[in-house]
From Swiss-Prot:
Name the record gives this protein: Ketol-acid reductoisomerase (NADP(+))
Location of the KARI N-terminal Rossmann domain: 3-184
Family the UniProt entry places it in: Belongs to the ketol-acid reductoisomerase family.
Catalytic residue list: H109
Length: 330
């Protein structure tokens, strides 16, 4: 691997155990991280605004809940586990004014720091600890004595505590050292994460799935078959990719499917490469971040319109029917 990788044997858990951790936010990531840290004998408190619906949940799970200002004043390490677009508003009002030299502020994604939404005072550390998976998987893997890969990065050093040692120790407390903790930068994590979401995992995959479905429908094929071939079976392929890689996927499909994939890749590849380069450039030059923050300032008009329209599409209507047996089993 090109990136440095650290495992449990390389990391001192005592570093984070000696510090008071405060987590701002108690969504999927906040809850999972808090529970994992506590099970790793780390002192954890939760910071929430007054009236938050998460207060009762956090208290029910045995955590002390403070206001954000109070949490900052009583913590050595403060983790900002809030949506990216809220970092600037919350941190500028309730975190930064109350920070002292030597404290460390942590993030699970590099967006707000990399795009200068958040600038921390000199002497305050800025670290990234990013589990490579959702909160549910982070908790489930920890309880199975396994873990998720974690990324760490250091943007700014603390005048008191070694930021790298703290980031590594925090990742170990969440189970990251069981799988591997990779050291990167805020820039690399942020830009690659956004690109993966837009070009492949969310934007790219959704576009291919929907276009494939519509192509079959317009050609007169039944909606059920179009859904099975273009949506339902994505999980089968994704699981093979996840566990066995591209070569392993090839070994588990028919010769017909493999030859067809190679033939289809040739015309699609050139077009996709050019489009992906444009997507990456807009991420790198800050255009996407600017557009997203403008969308937030206008109260998400495009997101709301798209979400409403999606419910009315054929792919969702037939999908809801075909997914019903699976959801019923859960």
């Amino acid at each position: 691997m090109a990136l440095p990788v650290y495992y449990d044997k390389d990391i001192d858990l005592g570093v984070i155990q000696s510090l008071q951790v405060g987590i701002i936010g108690y969504g999927a990531q906040g809850e999972a991280q808090a529970l994992n840290l506590r099970d790793s004998k780390v002192k954890v408190r939760i910071g929430l605004y007054q009236g938050s619906l998460s207060v009762s949940k956090a208290k029910k799970e045995g955590f002390e809940v403070l206001g954000v200002k109070e949490l900052v004043q009583q913590s050595d390490v403060i983790m900002a586990l809030l949506p990216d677009e809220l970092h600037k508003e919350v941190l500028e009002k309730e975190v930064i004014p109350f920070l002292k030299e030597g404290q460390i502020v942590g993030f699970a994604h590099g967006f707000s720091v990399h795009f200068n939404q958040v600038v921390l005072p000199k002497g305050v550390g800025a670290i990234l600890v990013a589990p490579k998976g959702p909160g549910s998987a982070l908790r489930e893997e920890y309880l199975k004595n396994r873990g998720l890969y974690h990324l760490i990065a250091i943007e700014q050093e603390s005048s008191k505590n070694n930021a790298k040692a703290v980031a590594l120790s925090y990742a170990k407390a969440m189970g990251g050292g069981r799988m591997g903790v990779l050291k990167t930068s805020f820039k690399e994590e942020c830009e690659s994460d956004l690109f993966g979401e837009q070009a492949v995992l969310c934007g790219g995959l959704e576009a291919i799935v929907r276009m494939g479905f519509e192509t079959l429908i317009k050609a007169g094929y039944p909606e059920e078959l179009a859904y099975f071939e273009c949506v339902h079976e994505v999980k089968l392929v994704a699981d093979l990719l996840h566990y066995k890689g591209v070569e392993g996927l090839r070994k588990h499909i028919s010769n017909t499917a493999e030859f067809g994939a190679i033939k289809a890749r040739e015309p699609m590849g050139n077009l996709l490469e050019k489009r992906m380069q444009k997507i990456l450039k807009k991420i790198q030059n800050g255009s996407f971040a600017k557009d997203f923050l403008l969308e937030k300032s206008l109260n998400y008009p495009r997101l709301n319109t798209e979400r409403k329209a999606l419910k009315e599409t054929k792919i969702e209507q037939i999908g809801e029917i075909l997914r019903a047996p699976f959801n019923h089993k859960k």
